[in-house]
Regions:
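Aromatic-glycine-rich donor-binding/catalytic loop that engages nucleotide-sugar donors
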Residues: 59-70
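Hydrophobic residues within well-ordered alpha-helices
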Residues: 77, 84, 107, 158-164, ...
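Hinge/lid segment of periplasmic solute-binding proteins
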Residues: 2-52, 62, 75-78, 86, ...
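Glycine-centered hinge/linker elements that transmit conformational signals in sensory
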Residues: 80-82, 120-150
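Alpha-to-beta junction loops
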Residues: 1, 12-13, 90, 163-171
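Short helix-initiation/N-cap motifs at beta->coil->alpha
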Residues: 72-78, 147-159
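Bilobed periplasmic-binding protein-like "clamshell/Venus-flytrap" ligand-binding domains
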Residues: 43-44, 85-97, 142-145
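Short, solvent-exposed loop/beta-turn-alpha elements that line the ligand-binding surface or hinge
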Residues: 18-30, 70, 87, 112-132
Length: 171
């Protein structure tokens, strides 16, 4: 997806799929189609819209008396993470540094984006500022720390979870 824009520059070498997608538009998340559109034409159709989920290692959490079912907000997550760190010296959750999955989740949750409605770069808008602040607050509270290897899909990330270095994963 991140490379798709490269294929829509200049003389587009892709087939316009607008008419083929039209009967299905009501069943597709419209914002996903925007990723594959240029000048009103659709050049690709997404086949996946990922959901965000939280995974908790209940064995680790039970050991320190944290009930993951009570975590409903980022404040709850921060409180549980601080308690977990106090009890174990380990991190509750993580922040990735290579994929920005967590950051992008927060930006979207806050109703923001990297560009404004006119397509202009907007990296200092309030949603982005608030997402960065929330990540900083979580880290300052010892609720999260940086993921070894930069992300959960790296060998170091796999090992960190297998070793019990983190009790929660948001993805």
């Amino acid at each position: 997806v991140s490379k798709f824009a490269n294929f829509t520059e200049g003389d587009v070498q892709l087939m316009d799929m607008t008419e083929y997608a039209e009967p299905y538009r009501e069943y597709v998340v419209e914002s996903r189609l925007g990723l594959f559109s240029r000048e009103g034409k659709l050049y690709g159709c997404p086949t996946h819209v990922g959901a965000t989920v939280a995974f908790y290692n209940t064995e680790l959490l039970d050991g320190v008396g944290i009930d993951y079912t009570t975590i409903k907000t980022w404040d709850d997550f921060k409180e549980a993470g601080s308690k977990y760190h106090e009890e174990t010296g380990k991190s509750f959750g993580n922040l990735d540094t290579s994929t920005n999955m967590f950051f992008n989740l927060l930006v979207a949750e806050l109703g923001s984006d990297y560009v404004d409605s006119d397509g202009n770069l907007s990296v200092n808008n309030q949603g982005i500022v608030d997402a960065i602040q929330l990540m900083k607050d979580l880290q300052d509270a010892n609720a999260v720390s940086l993921m070894p290897g930069g992300n959960t899909d790296a060998d170091e990330g796999f090992a960190a979870y297998a070793n019990g270095d983190f009790a929660a994963m948001i993805m």
